[in-house]
Amino acid sequence: YGLGSANKDLPAFVVLLSKNTDPQAQPIYARLWGSSFLPSNHQGVKFRSGADPVLYLKDPTGDTPKGRRQLLDSLSELNQIRQAETGNPEINTRIAAYEMAHRMQMSVPDLTDLSKEPESTFKLYGEDARNPGSHAANCLLARRLCERGVRFIQLYHRGWDHHSNIPGRHPKITKETDQGSAALVMDL
């Protein structure tokens, strides 16, 4: 029950990393959303900060959805042949990832389109929610992911590891995170 997504078009585990606003912010490593002892299909899928959270949502110029489907089917056949030869379970994970990416081409644009959100939502989350990649926008996106059946959403906002100028830096970062975080908790 707890593993997998309730939505076949989105991953079960999504990572949202806010745009870096602090030049001294600590780095965030992908191992933080790895699958550890679980199969790799349970690792987190990082959505990029900004207006285009997932690359290649649109087919390349000259390609059609039918052509893309044929390409994926051919690639799947080749991967299945290789999997039969080697018995490597990671090949099945790769096939599933290609299929998920194809389905995400349809679901992510609707997910990230905030134009249908009422003005009251932006009052609740703050005006920064209109700025793709901001913490407030990621909180709103997390709510929308949750509504669509994504079971685990991890929000990262760097810059909390202050070792100097705490009175100068801490108010700035709390201003960036407080309203969006509170709105997300209220919405959930």
Residue ranges and their predicted role:
Residues Y1-L188:
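Ligand-binding pockets and gating/stacking loops
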